């Protein structure tokens, strides 16, 4: 297992208030024509949100083969619903998981 440390970066237009659930996932995105596969997940609960805030996290990721490509995904929900809806915050581009755990990962999200 590897442990990654990171920060979720909220945008200037992020809502204030509490997020009931923040889900940080690592997904296997190796296959272009297939759904990604969940490899690791960490959840944070009852976290204060504010514009430009940075939210610290840690996630443990199992070792994978060199043929696998992993990517981070973040979903912030104010009401703990797993379905993405208007007002949630998400990563919207690919953030590859580095092979080295030393750098702190920064994951910007946008309001949807």
Language-model regions: role of each:
Residues 12-19, 64-67:
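A short beta-turn/strand-edge loop motif at beta-sheet boundaries
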Residues 23-27, 71-75:
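Beta-strand signatures of extracellular beta-sandwich domains
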Residues 75-90:
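Short acidic/polar inter-strand loop motif in beta-rich domains
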Residues 95-112:
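Extracellular beta-sheet/turn segments enriched in Thr/Pro/Gly and aliphatic residues
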């Amino acid at each position: 297992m590897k442990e990654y440390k990171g920060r979720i970066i909220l945008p200037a237009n992020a809502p204030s208030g509490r997020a009931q659930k923040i889900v940080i996932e690592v997904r296997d995105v190796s296959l272009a024509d297939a759904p990604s596969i969940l490899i690791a997940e960490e959840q944070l609960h009852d976290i204060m949100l504010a514009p430009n805030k940075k939210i610290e996290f840690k996630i443990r990721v199992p070792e994978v083969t060199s043929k696998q490509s992993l990517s981070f995904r973040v979903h912030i929900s104010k009401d703990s619903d797993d379905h993405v809806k208007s007002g949630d915050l998400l990563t919207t581009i690919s953030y590859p998981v580095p092979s080295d755990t030393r750098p702190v990962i920064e994951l910007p999200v946008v309001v949807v």
